[in-house]
Amino acid sequence: MLRKTYKYASFQLMLIFLISFFAFSATSVTSSASAVAKNNKLHGGIEIGSRGVKGTAINFSRKGSGYDVKIIYTEVINTSIMKVKDNKFTPEALQETAEAVNKMFARMQQEYQVPVEQIYIVGSSGLRSDNKPDLVSAVTKATGKPMSFLTVEMEVQLSIAGTIPRRREDETKPLDEREASMLLDIGSGNTKGGYQLSGTGPTDEFVTMGIPFGTVSFTNEASKLRKVEADLSSFALDALLISQHTLNEQLRKEVEKKPGLLSRNRIYLSGGIVWAMATLVHPENRKAFVSLTTDDITLFHYRARNDVNALLNPDLSFIADELKRNEIKKDVESVKATFSPKNIIAGAEILNAVNSEFKLQGKNIWFARYGHLSWILSYVRGQAEKQLLTAERSTTSALK
């Protein structure tokens, strides 16, 4: 049975954000299937991650020397795929995930007329288990489509392209934001990040890193310390006890191998636990880029360890606008539906380790609100661009 589904309805705000980092012109979002049906430049992507399944569809076409991209559909369905047993996806989780994928797969075709051959199904690098082929089989059986998996390096590169804009619309600094910044993404299955090297070569080069622990997988790791399920206080102690070896030491080794990871002073944080922190610590700030400080991370870590239930139920009475307050309440409820209290505690430990090992004190830090869709959108756009360029070359050759 599928768990609660969240649709991201605020397409206009998201579109404004996406315009800057894809460096293309997008003028409007068409939500009606009848309008979309007239355009055959439709592509869709389905991402299977450690927290669930994300789907997106775009209308992609040539516009002058660039491209015109319109986002026509996004959806997120949380699943229990990372509730592994003996380091294997359970049959129930496999079925649940395959059903979620098939639901999006069918919707893209039926409601948005995306051609079946232009829907791509991709697994996140954070999916770790001994029976990945069983997931591929379940998805292929449900959809008739093959699926592939990204490496950490590929996912970081796509996420950087999709999260960090070349230019910030809300800033006046005359710099290439992507060549001055670094991305750190705390996913459910792993923690990864990196930066794009400055240069004028024909292709972009990146420095990437990753460790195999994210919010859910670290929750699972800390839960192994006791034969019986721990209460929240005991779990917080267990997570703290293993964090130095499991998190800090592994992050430190990555930094030692690639010291340039400490050189960037503009840091973009993404991932579900960062969204949770921004929502709970700064509920009133709903911008595309939310400014954060290391004090925010320290406070979040302290409150998660000492009174996670109070943290998950913030006082919103200071927000005078009732409409805005009700919208924020929905955001808070989404956090609670997405993460268990133990997930919040585990994620706070990862944030604390990232803060320490990447020496974030004194750096400019932002939460990238729409980073959760960044790599799948980048992937779909890349596939659409590749197909369009191939078609254009074929047309040019035929005319010679």
Identify what each model region corresponds to:
Residues F21-A37:
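Bacterial Sec-dependent signal peptides at the C-terminal "C-region" and cleavage site
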Residues Q12-A23:
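Bacterial N-terminal signal peptides
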Residues V36-V69, D170, P174-F206, G272:
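Gly/Thr-rich phosphate-binding beta-strand-loop-beta motif of the actin/hexokinase/Hsp70
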Residues N39-P146:
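Conserved phosphate-binding loops in N-terminal lobes of ATP-dependent enzymes
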Residues G123-L127, I186-T191, I267-V274:
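Glycine-rich beta-strand-to-loop/alpha-helix junction loops that act as flexible
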Residues M1-Y8:
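N-terminal secretory signal peptides that target proteins for export/translocation
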Residues V84-N102, A106, Y112-Q113, S129-N131, ...:
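Helical "lid/coupling" subdomains associated with nucleotide-phosphate turnover
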Residues A9-Q12, E75:
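Composition-driven detection of intrinsically disordered, low-complexity segments
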